Amino acid sequence: MGITVLKNEGLDFHARISTPLSEIDDDIQKELLDLTKKVKIPGFRAGKVPVSIVKKKYGTSVRNDIIERRINHSVNHIIKEHNLNIIGRPKIEELQNESDKALEFTVKIELLPKITIPDLKKISLDRPKLEVNSKDVEEQLEKLAALTKNYTKESKAKIKDGDQVTIDAIGYIKEKTFEDGKLNDFKVIIGSNALIPGFEKQLIGSKTGSKVDVNVTFPENYHAKDLAGKDARFVVQIKAVHTAEPTVIDDEFAKKFQSNSLEELRTHFTKQIENESEEAINTIMKMNLFDKLEKLLDFDVPESLLEQEKNILKSGTDKNEQDESLLKDKSSKEITAYYNKLALRRVRIGLLLAEYAKSKNLQLEPDDLRKVIMQQARNFPGQENMIFDFYKNNPRAIEGLKGPALEDKAVQYIFNHEIKLKEKKYTKEELEKYLEAEEQRITLI
């Protein structure tokens, strides 16, 4: 076997490989002789079939198998001989495979870069810390109390905010009724914004037995596209008005929600408020870490990974209206530059984290995958069981989660053992503003 290295620079390794015709013919002859002992052909005893007959029947397929094995052997030999850290499948080009000539081909191999892990201990980040105060907890208690109000007291007074109103309604667009434009015995809490914006306010001041004309405009993003943005008039019959009995927030109230006391319920809400922001905090901290890493990394990346990531980004943008709107006023040159920069960032950071996980011998545990599946499920409220069933019944889909799961594990390890974290305290309102601003920023990266 002759090997001529054509290119060995950067992340590209190209070589021309030649195997003498005599070696190919010897391999074919040995394979045919073996087949004479195994094949069964009518008219011949087992093990006594002439080579010429076997060659006539199986010669082409045997030669193809030998060529494939020779190519694979040669490529594996080159990879081992030159200690190549490859990515993807080697490409075979310019194949010369005539039966009367030596086997020759060019192999093109893409390499993974040599990655030097930067000194992560020099990185410092702020870690947002939510300080839950009594006002935050009381607001949650009030919301819970509002959800559990008993509207048992019928009222003959004028409708006001907080009343429960039972209505019949018929909707008209340009004086014509429309599909799903009727309500019968519909109960609505005034001020709950359960109906089209502006609908409930126009019922205030009316009484049981009144007929009210309500004029509204369907929102542009209304789920029924044929109604979105259109003006409508509803003729509303007020059938009944009920006021809520006052809810006393005390230990007895808490016991309705599996808490032994009001103090225990308050503790539950404190933890719930903290947990609600934890995932968003972790996502933003991860992006802030990636911002720091991006400035430290300058190694070349495989072109195939770069193209693959750009295609993923473009596909994601096509499906995401928010991302699409970010690019709608950009020139094709600016859009290409955006995708190139973002793809390069993601591939570099992904390769670094994979190398870091390897250096720390980080291994995935079943719980790591469960966490990633839970994160996926949270993206589809009300369809969680469907997501769980999907991954339960699709092992290959779980394979696709292993990369992100290991990346998350590496990031958490870096947070816990490498970088300096400085706790920065926020009130609930301050944290919500901070998270909103950060979420808008990271849509660009």
Swiss-Prot record:
A biological-process GO annotation: protein unfolding
Job of this protein: Involved in protein export. Acts as a chaperone by maintaining the newly synthesized protein in an open conformation. Functions as a peptidyl-prolyl cis-trans isomerase.
Protein's cellular compartments: Cytoplasm
A single cellular component GO annotation: cytoplasm
Annotated PPIase FKBP-type domain residues: 162-247
EC number per UniProt: 5.2.1.8
Membership in a protein family: Belongs to the FKBP-type PPIase family. Tig subfamily.
Protein name, UniProt field: Trigger factor
Keyword terms, alphabetized: Cell cycle, Cell division, Chaperone, Cytoplasm, Isomerase, Rotamase
Gene3D superfamilies: 3.10.50.40, Trigger factor ribosome-binding domain (3.30.70.1050), Trigger factor, C-terminal domain (1.10.3120.10)
Source lineage: Bacteria, Pseudomonadati, Pseudomonadota, Alphaproteobacteria, Rickettsiales
Pfam families xref list: FKBP_C, Trigger_C, Trigger_N
SUPFAM superfamilies, A to Z: FKBP-like, Triger factor/SurA peptide-binding domain-like, Trigger factor ribosome-binding domain
Catalytic function, reaction form: [protein]-peptidylproline (omega=180) = [protein]-peptidylproline (omega=0)
Database matches in PANTHER family: TRIGGER FACTOR CHAPERONE AND PEPTIDYL-PROLYL CIS/TRANS ISOMERASE (PTHR30560), TRIGGER FACTOR-LIKE PROTEIN TIG, CHLOROPLASTIC (PTHR30560:SF3)
A GO molecular-function descriptor: peptidyl-prolyl cis-trans isomerase activity
Enzyme's top EC category: isomerase
Domains: entry comment: Consists of 3 domains; the N-terminus binds the ribosome, the middle domain has PPIase activity, while the C-terminus has intrinsic chaperone activity on its own.
